[in-house]
Amino acid sequence: MTQEELDALMNGGDLENLEALETKEETKEEAKEEAKEEAKEEAKEKEEIKEESSSQKMTVKKEDAEKYGKISPNEWPPPPPTEEHKVVHQLDDVTRDSEVKATQIFDQLDLIGASAEKIAKMVKKIQEPLQKHQEIFDNLHGHFPHVESFKTALNEQQEILNALKSIEEEAANCSDSSMQAMDIMQFQDIHRQKIERVVNVMRALSQYMNSLFEGKIDDSKRVSSATFITGDDDKDLASADDIEALIASFGAK
């Protein structure tokens, strides 16, 4: 009987009031128990979610580790420092290969520009005699306007000169485009310089970290690390109780 029930009886309360108080008290207890159960379930769910997320981040597939393939950024540890995963090596390869390919592209653009200039010179050589022929046919057509062959030859000569002029213009456009392409290719040299700057910063940072963690004792003379320290959680090791039980079993035999 609670203090409230005792006070009710002392004040002359009847049994109905007493039962009402008991019912109210039981309801409070049940509400408290339900709240505790809900809090426990929520805490358990949060713990499970945390364990799942941590296990996903710390998982590495065995086949990925064996073949040193691509590893997801959410997995740990990162790829081993093999030749294909060394960052500075890859950046050096990029700068070297891009410089070689850029040189080849410049050579091809230079060849295109030189060929366009040759075409323009050849067109000029052809135009000179054709212009003289046009003057001749023009005089003939002026003196003999009724001769149809002179008129036809004059028109054909004019069409040839117009075609040569178009070829000369296209050759000039080709030469200008090759020069513009060479100017645009200057971005490759700028990118190479940026990559080299990044490589130099990374190398300086690597040397700084090596100097920062450098020790006075040589690695060959340094004491090896303990495989197990008291307090570590390792199921493969026997505890003190297991050892005592084993000794006791030998004594019993």
Swiss-Prot record:
Keyword Methyltransferase listed? The answer is no
Basic and acidic residues composition bias: residue spans? 21-69
Molecular function per GO:
phosphatase activity
Keyword tags = Cytoplasm, Hydrolase
Superkingdom classification of source: Bacteria
Q: Which GO terms describe its cellular component?
A: cytoplasm
Kindly give the Gene3D superfamilies that the UniProt entry links to this protein: Helix hairpin bin
Any idea where this protein resides?
A: Cytoplasm
Cite the effect that the entry attributes to D189N: Complete loss of phosphatase activity. Migrates poorly through the soft agar
Record InterPro entries: CheZ_Pase
Role this protein plays:
Plays an important role in bacterial chemotaxis signal transduction pathway by accelerating the dephosphorylation of phosphorylated CheY (CheY-P). Also dephosphorylates CheV2 but not CheV1 or CheV3. In addition, forms a distinct chemotaxis regulatory complex with ChePep independently of the core chemotaxis signaling proteins.
Similarity-based family: Belongs to the CheZ family.
What protein does this entry describe? Protein phosphatase CheZ
Q: What is the lineage of its organism?
A: Bacteria, Pseudomonadati, Campylobacterota, Epsilonproteobacteria, Campylobacterales
- Give the gene name: cheZ
